[in-house]
From Swiss-Prot:
UniProt KW keywords: Host-virus interaction, Metal-binding, mRNA processing, Nucleus, Phosphoprotein, Repeat, RNA-binding, Zinc, Zinc-finger
DNA-binding recorded as keyword: no
GO aspect biological process, one term: mRNA processing
Protein name: Cleavage and polyadenylation specificity factor subunit 4
Gene, per the UniProt record: CPSF4
Length: 269
């Protein structure tokens, strides 16, 4: 009734103008001070604040949805530049690690969110379409719903507000459900013709040479076998005739088996 008889909406007091223009606001003595209890800077929202880090009001950029866990302990050094919220809001706290990992939290006064794991499970798109091959072992939620008869016929007057289910007939294509490309189905032998032909011809020659019992092996095969035997022989320990003791300088034994002592090399000079 007072607003109808004596409205003051057209009157603007000097105090309101001073608050909007931040008149009398003194800059901070040094940057990095805690401004969690201060108001939001109106000029920063309009990109017109020239005080920078010395501004006594908060500079909020974007929508911050999670509370800063370092700010809760008084250890956040970013100040207004922090990408998390510097405000104690229980609805915007981070998720509790122990409750999400083990399903329980022993802290009765835990400040973090305890989110029900069932709420994180999404609906199965295959089951909503009509059939899911994974059955009860599916990692997604299988919710039984009653299909709208009007929607199956072709039109439902209720639209999105219908209490029955409007099924989706498009197939959900995942990374594992996609059919292979035609290039991947081709065998690798068709891509390069020359190397397999040369390899097959060499195998035919070797089998034809080894098929006759009276025919001797070719020098190439013998050379390959000798090189294999020599490489196999080099893998073993060397004979003692080729071993030289670095203590006494004589051959025939290792340095750890030398009986002349560590000053034996002086006797040879």
């Amino acid at each position: 009734m007072q607003e109808i008889i004596a409205s003051v909406d057209h009157i603007k007091f000097d105090l309101e103008i001073a608050v909007e223009q931040q008149l009398g606001a003194q800059p901070l003595p040094f940057p990095g001070m805690d401004k969690s209890g201060a108001a939001v800077c109106e000029f920063f929202l309009k990109a017109a604040c020239g005080k920078g880090g010395m501004c006594p009001f908060r500079h909020i950029s974007g929508e911050k949805t999670v509370v800063c866990k370092h700010w809760l302990r008084g250890l956040c050094k970013k100040g207004d530049q922090c990408e998390f919220l510097h405000e104690y809001d229980m609805t915007k706290m981070p998720e509790c690690y122990f409750y999400s990992k083990f399903g329980e939290c022993s802290n009765k006064e835990c400040p973090f969110l305890h989110i029900d794991p069932e709420s994180k499970i999404k609906d199965c798109p295959w089951y909503d379409r009509g059939f899911c091959k994974h059955g009860p072992l599916c990692r997604h939620r299988h919710t039984r719903r009653v299909i709208c008869v009007n929607y199956l016929v072709g039109f439902c007057p209720e639209g999105p507000s219908c209490k029955f289910m409007h099924p989706r007939f498009e197939l959900p294509m995942g990374t594992t459900e996609q059919p292979p490309l035609p290039q991947q189905t081709q065998p690798p032998a068709k891509q390069s013709n020359n190397p397999p032909l040369q390899r097959s011809s060499s195998l035919i020659q070797l089998t034809s040479q080894n098929s006759s019992p009276n025919q001797q092996r070719t020098p190439q095969v013998i050379g390959v076998m000798q090189s294999q035997n020599s490489s196999a022989g080099n893998r073993g320990p060397r004979p003692l005739e080729q071993v030289t003791c670095y203590k006494c300088g004589e051959k025939g034994h290792y340095a750890n088996r030398c009986t002349k002592g560590h000053l034996a090399f002086l006797s040879g000079q």
